[in-house]
Curated annotation (Swiss-Prot):
HAMAP family, sorted: BioD (MF_00336)
Keyword Cytoplasm tagged: yes
Residues involved in Mg(2+) binding: 16, 46, 105
GO cellular component, as recorded: cytosol
Keywords per UniProt: ATP-binding, Biotin biosynthesis, Cytoplasm, Ligase, Magnesium, Metal-binding, Nucleotide-binding
Cofactor(s) the protein requires to work: Mg(2+)
Broad class of enzyme this protein falls into: ligase
Family from the record: Belongs to the dethiobiotin synthetase family.
Subunit composition and interactions: Homodimer.
Protein name: ATP-dependent dethiobiotin synthetase BioD
Length: 229
């Protein structure tokens, strides 16, 4: 089993589209069982999108759902509940036992709280997952990545690689000015797997698979290998 946590520098950084692109590529080329696990979702969006894109071709797991689009402990408290970390772990173990690939989509960034004293970074460390960090390609992305990679190392995470995501259309000139790959790799001491281009048809599985293909080719043998799972 290969498992990986896809985290972002913030809410709306491109985690969901990246997970979908990687899953679409996997289903098209590996043809072995895969799952996307969204441990906690607050408000509608991600799981519904995945189910629209993949239907029955992919297991979409969401053990905890809360109505309010807030940080998980606050959303849970509104419903008189708490975030059961043990339930999340059980769901991951069950997914790992039955799938060749489990993409775990984080909530917000690595510092996002899952409980009152537990963050996404704690989950990544406790579950011993390699982390793929995605950041939106815009002005300021270099500083965001430097800050987040520093935080990840301070938390003793297995931060393995970076991805840039065009959440909006970006020109070649803007890409070069805002996100110089050599500069990012020098400062973060991590490989940039590539740029996930903006997709006009984000529910098109073929387009998603094509977008994920370059990232998978770069990641092969380093991030998503059964030995690391």
């Amino acid at each position: 089993m290969a498992g990986v946590l896809v985290s972002g520098t913030d809410t709306g950084a491109g985690k969901t589209i990246l997970c979908a692109a990687l899953a679409a590529w996997w289903l098209a080329h590996r043809r072995t069982p895969a799952a996307i696990l969204k441990p906690v979702q607050c408000g509608p969006g991600d799981r519904e999108y995945y189910r629209t894109v993949f239907g029955d071709a992919l297991s979409v797991l969401n053990p905890l759902y809360f109505e309010a689009p807030l940080a998980p402990p606050l959303a849970a408290a509104r419903e008189g509940q708490t975030v059961d970390i043990g339930l999340l772990w059980k769901s991951y173990c069950e997914a790992a036992a039955g799938h060749a690939l489990v993409l775990v989509e984080g909530v917000g960034g690595l510092g996002c709280p899952l409980g009152w004293d537990y963050t996404v970074a704690d989950l990544a460390r406790d579950w011993r997952l390699p982390v793929l960090l995605v950041a939106p390609l815009r002005l300021g992305v270099v500083g965001q990545l430097v800050a987040h990679t520093g935080f990840a190392r301070a938390q003793n995470l297995d931060l393995s690689a970076l991805v840039l995501s065009e959440i909006e259309p970006v020109s070649a000139e803007q890409r070069a000015q805002w996100a110089d790959v050599q500069l990012i790799e020098n400062l973060c001491h991590l490989p940039v797997l590539g740029v996930l281009s903006h997709l006009e048809a984000a529910t098109d599985r073929a387009a998603l698979a094509a977008a994920g293909s370059g990232l998978w080719l770069e990641a092969a043998g380093t991030l998503f290998t059964a030995e690391r799972g």
